[in-house]
């Protein structure tokens, strides 16, 4: 054995099915996977971005240009690609919008990093340079950002409209922006330190098909898209005691399989009487609690429905968990999971009315501390209202972030071009090879205005030249108007973005790129993916598994 080792033969420590790729091959594999994800969504960026049609394994169709929705619905079968998807999810959770921007920048950072790697610049130097650039970019964002008053409704509407532009909600963006800003203002409170806190837990979004999006409205309280369980139940209460129930009002089933042998009609009647008595006891417990209205998350037996109707109690079954949670907020009720422990103290107070035409219940809490509101979105089809809801949810998150953060930026690629210019100036003060990484970072940021122009059918090079010239003249707000093709003041054009979303996009993209660059060795117990093959564009080098559902994806989507 020692003789073989002296002859330079390697020691085999992994199983025969294991695969390993090292150094440049590993970096090339990871960068290719990350860029494939970025390519998949970059055509959706901006007001002129295209939509994607996603068909899942069940045949359900989703049509959207929302970055995080696209990446979540895609069948991604690659560990590196999944890391980039996490960038979009983090951006969505932290800022509510800017997911496509974050992923696109991450992909461009890695593309530029690959060029540096080919120049024999060590990944550690690139990572240090990217960290310096990211930190400097966030400092400059804060310096460039303009402060916004939470009472400035017009500016907040522009933020909402910018978020919705290019989505299905764009056709009615003025109406929807007004509803969104009013909703956010109703759930905003001022903290002791003067900051503003927006509680989006008190904002619910409900959808209804069959009508136009222009008929969407903002309602105080909750909207429950359910019917009463019995036609004889009252549906109107000015002041009602509300019970939220997470227990079925049905005959209790045993935990084990049992068989009952019935030998006579009397035995059958006793059995039925026992079930009826059990249901009657549950109904009596509800009646004794003083509840006028019951929203039950589970089922209600037909006989129990009859008893509740006789007592003049309104009951709704199979209420969504999210609706129960929202009703808890606006009525002050506690959710009861065991009728045996019910007390009057767990009941909430609310007014309840029925919209027979829309088949909806409107529930409005009673009291000074009630702030819950519902955005009722309407559209012609399920596909329309689903995409409308995604657009409104993003805009809602962005407006809430703007109110809490208090800073806005010019959109249309203005902030990216300005940051790139300032980073290039900053690079002159950076020593070593990190300077090249800072410059590469600046180039990556300019991807945003380039893609905005490409997606609008404009010449990206001419557009970038015009933007750079405007910013060199000191026009910090100069951005691309994709509708006219002109470079103009983005604020005057109403293209306004929240600073927090842009900061988060820069931070998330940088961290993801650095995480990928830091990997120099991939060791897999078997194939890295279950699909794809090495001949695909997305295939891995060195015999590694392919990209699965990602192979060649950038061109297919």
UniProtKB/Swiss-Prot annotation:
One GO molecular-function entry: ATP-dependent protein folding chaperone
Q: Where is this region: Disordered?
A: 527-557
Where does the source fall among the domains of life? Answer: Archaea
Q: Which Pfam families does this chain map to?
A: Cpn60_TCP1
| Gly residues compositional bias, start-end | 539-557
Give the induction annotation: By heat shock (at protein level).
Q: Mind telling me which InterPro entries this protein's record contains?
A: Chaperone_TCP-1, Chaperonin_TCP-1_CS, Cpn60/GroEL/TCP-1, GroEL-like_apical_dom_sf, GROEL-like_equatorial_sf, TCP-1-like_intermed_sf, TCP-1_chaperonin, thermosome_alpha
Entry keywords, A to Z:
ATP-binding, Chaperone, Nucleotide-binding, Stress response
Residues crossing the lipid bilayer are none
Complex formation: The thermosome or CCT complex is a oligomeric complex of two octameric double-ring structures; the complex is probably a heterooligomer of CCT1, CCT2 and CCT3 with yet unknown stoichiometry.
Q: What else is known?
A: One of either CCT1 or CCT2 is required for growth.
Specify the protein name. Thermosome subunit 2
Q: Which organism is it from?
A: Haloferax volcanii (strain ATCC 29605 / DSM 3757 / JCM 8879 / NBRC 14742 / NCIMB 2012 / VKM B-1768 / DS2)
Q: What is the lineage of its organism?
A: Archaea, Methanobacteriati, Methanobacteriota, Stenosarchaea group, Halobacteria
Q: Which gene encodes it?
A: cct2
